[in-house]
């Protein structure tokens, strides 16, 4: 997931450098969405690991 966020971030930087602001805004928006999804999934797994980890040991 973070791989795709980085790919869209690089694409948005290239598009911004070339002056295609519409493409840059769209790819930056997609990269932000993917980043936030990855953070939410990380937090869910962190909470699950803390909850289940205590039960296992």
From Swiss-Prot:
The keyword Transmembrane applies. Its main location: membrane. One of its GO terms (cellular component) is plasma membrane. This is UPF0391 membrane protein Smed_4051. The keyword Transmembrane applies. It is found in: Cell membrane. Pfam families: DUF1328. The chain crosses the membrane at residues 4-24, 33-53. It is a multi-pass membrane protein. Keywords: Cell membrane, Membrane, Plasmid, Transmembrane, Transmembrane helix. Disulfide bonds: none annotated. Belongs to the UPF0391 family. It comes from Sinorhizobium medicae (strain WSM419) (Ensifer medicae).
